[in-house]
Amino acid sequence: MAAPAGGLGDAELREAQRDYLDFLDDEEDQGVYHGKVRDMISDNQYRLLVNINDLRRRNEKRANRLLSNAFEELIAFQRALKDFVASVDATYAKQYEDFYIGLEGSFGSKHVSPRTLTACFLSCIVCVEGIVTKCSLIRPKVVRSVHYCPATKKTIERRYTDLTSLDAFPSSTVYPTKDEENNPLETEYGLSVYKDHQTISIQEMPEKAPAGQLPRSVDVILDDDLVDKVKPGDRIQVVGTYRCLPGKKGGYTSGTFRTILIACHIKQMSKDARPLYSANDVAKIKRFSKSRSKDIFNQLARSLAPSIHGHEFIKKALLCMLLGGVEKVLENGSRIRGDINILLIGDPSVAKSQLLRYVLGTAPRAVGTTGRGSSGVGLTAAVTTDQETGERRLEAGAMVLADRGVVCIDEFDKMSDIDRTAIHEVMEQGRVTIAKAGIHARLNSRCSVLAAANPVYGRYDQYKTPMENIGLQDSLLSRFDLLFIMLDQMDSEQDREISDHVLRMHRYRNPNEQDGDAMPLGSAVEILATDDPDFAQEEEQELQVYEKHDDLLHGPNRRKEKIVSMEFMRKYIHVAKMIKPVLTQESADYIAEEYSSLRSQNQMNSDIARTSPVTARTLETLIRLSTAHAKARMSKTVDLQDAEAALELVQFAYFKKVLEKEKKRKKQVEDDSETEKEEEEEETQPEKEGRKQRRKKARTEGEEESYDPYDFSDAEQEMPEVQAHTPKTPESSATGEAKKPELADPRLKAFKAALLEVFKSSHAQSVGLKNVMESINRDNPEPFSLAGVKVALAHMQDDNQIMVSDDIIFLI
């Protein structure tokens, strides 16, 4: 065969055309491509998809030549297709200038990534996998121009080819304006033929790029029906011809060439890198969900990141994030997101980054980045200038590339405020809107955000409120569904457990690891075909539900706890995400009632502060977490137990105790040191159980009426419960012993009722003490003394119901 530069001779070209025509005309055989051509005609298409494996079986020599000498062979193949279409439907063949061939199947050594695409593949058919990072605008390119000369009444036709077409030699780019006799020509635009033309850039997959090296990219030329098939962020396989373009500078061709890929077929890879599972796997998943229906959520949460000790609530939240809620697009076009965003804030060395790394390895699609290494446009999208044409083009950022996945941002507090503001729209609306340099575009970025940050002071200061420690604006915090504060606490028993756990991790060794060999980070097996040939074999492999117990890996004390294997976890999450649970009326009423309780200031104690503001987004958070919990149970409805589990997570994440600084005293009781130790242990326990019992008791006592700012009876009922669950510091208990004489409960209730009438009758927020004394003692058979009134006012001031200043009573 002649070299590619010389091209095929006419005889060889005709022979190749005959071979391809015989391959297509298989009506006497199985009739596969005869039927495909008829389907192409009925669908009004002009590109036929051919499996290279079929051609290899019928004519191996021709298949090898097609892969190694693509330009001439593809021209012969397309001519054969046009002849075959003309024999089937002559009228349809005249409608289109050309018919095109698309290839799929197994390409073997020619199945490459942008990094392994080298000069040896020039003029060959290759299959390249990558992720789309840039897309140019669609431009019309002239294929044939028709010109009319009014003087001679003649018509001139000219065809144009360049290096992006299959022809060996490009035609002249001069557009005719005069004929040979210098008569002016008029262009007949209606008779001229144009084709669509677009350039995209694909980059190698982030998970397949070698660590520490920049990802490589390659430009792809799309023509005709292939344009606008992909957008930034899509993962695709491109089959096409690899070609080099000479670079001209000042009329001279330089020695370096620019390489491009001329596409003939594009296949969208699955948006969710879905695991392969068989009917047997689905049966195991259903059996597992039914057998462990009571504690299946806790079982899965314990199996998340088993190498990390503790953090039970955070693991439950991460499981909810991986499962996700249900996204809703309303009729008016507005979208209610189903993605769950989580922020981890805490001291150094509490496994924040390790949890992020685990999610990166578990989620089907995850992109990891850091605060210092990310800019606002790098996370969302950027408008860049094409060096070749000078036109503007859109470049996708990390959040667009992670559409339908998870974005893990470490060192979130190190980002600048301007860059953090750029992700506001992404976190709530799930899209990126760009309006720059004449480009107005909207890209999907429906992803969950998992961020880890350190407090403002490096370590968490428990004597300051959470808001002072976090140092992020409320507009950003309200977009996070859950905010967890992770503390490095001084507890000898817990430290002993952690040290034992970490030492066991260092002593553990994978049984498959050989001496002196490091295990690979990713899978060493790559599929060198557009379709997975080993799909059936992988289906037959037995799916292990539980990991085999190992004393070093799981600990000798956890023999009874079964850990779900990573592969089963991936498949279970993928199946559970497909379920769309519906809220029941009971759970909806419960969520609405608990949301109003969270908003109420009466739930706040003096030493408890909120980690993030409770807004209307908190209501959506409760719904999303309830839905995720229902998905874990494989339930089609969101029941009351799901709503209660979601509320438990929210209570743990939203409330944080603030310590009071101790004042030095000259005399200290011996028991003080013991009580302080007990209080420090109590501070480590979350306050959720106390609040949950208080709300349940309050609901049974009939606190569902509308809120009255002048009514003090509710607070009085709650006060003994609040005191029962609020540990007091030694100073507060000591000062409490030296208080003024107590007022009897009936007298205190009578005073509150009288004061209520005074405020209602005066229609004011503040009343003088003198006026109060006159009003409450008027027509009162048992008048209040001034000392008794002051004791009652002190009680109410302690309950944050009023404030007394300069004998003026202010209503709070």
UniProtKB/Swiss-Prot annotation:
Chain spans, region Disordered: 663-741
Keywords: ATP-binding, Cell cycle, Chromosome, DNA replication, DNA-binding, Helicase, Hydrolase, Nucleotide-binding, Nucleus
Residues given in the record as ATP binding sites: A524, R665
Magnesium among keywords: no
UniProt binding sites for ADP: Q354, L394, E395, A396, A398
Predominant location: nucleus
GO CC list: CMG complex; MCM complex; nucleus
InterPro entries hit by this protein: AAA+_ATPase (IPR003593), MCM (IPR031327), Mcm3 (IPR008046), MCM_CS (IPR018525), MCM_dom (IPR001208), MCM_lid (IPR041562), MCM_N (IPR027925), MCM_OB (IPR033762)
Catalytic reactions of this protein: ATP + H2O = ADP + phosphate + H(+)
The MCM domain, residue ranges: 296-503
GO biological process: DNA strand elongation involved in DNA replication; double-strand break repair via break-induced replication; mitotic DNA replication initiation
Composition-biased stretches (Acidic residues): 671-684, 702-719
Subcellular location: Nucleus; Chromosome
UniProt keyword annotation of Nucleotide-binding present: yes
PROSITE patterns (alphabetical): MCM_1, MCM_2
One Pfam family named in its UniProt record: WH_MCM3_C
Gene3D superfamilies: 2.20.28.10, mini-chromosome maintenance (MCM) complex, chain A, domain 1, Nucleic acid-binding proteins, P-loop containing nucleotide triphosphate hydrolases
Taxonomic superkingdom: Eukaryota
E.C. number: 3.6.4.12
Record's function text: Acts as a component of the MCM2-7 complex (MCM complex) which is the replicative helicase essential for 'once per cell cycle' DNA replication initiation and elongation in eukaryotic cells. Core component of CDC45-MCM-GINS (CMG) helicase, the molecular machine that unwinds template DNA during replication, and around which the replisome is built.
Assembly and interaction partners: Component of the MCM2-7 complex. The complex forms a toroidal hexameric ring with the proposed subunit order MCM2-MCM6-MCM4-MCM7-MCM3-MCM5. Component of the CMG helicase complex, a hexameric ring of related MCM2-7 subunits stabilized by CDC45 and the tetrameric GINS complex.
Family listed: Belongs to the MCM family.
The name this protein goes by in its record: DNA replication licensing factor MCM3
Source organism: Gallus gallus (Chicken)
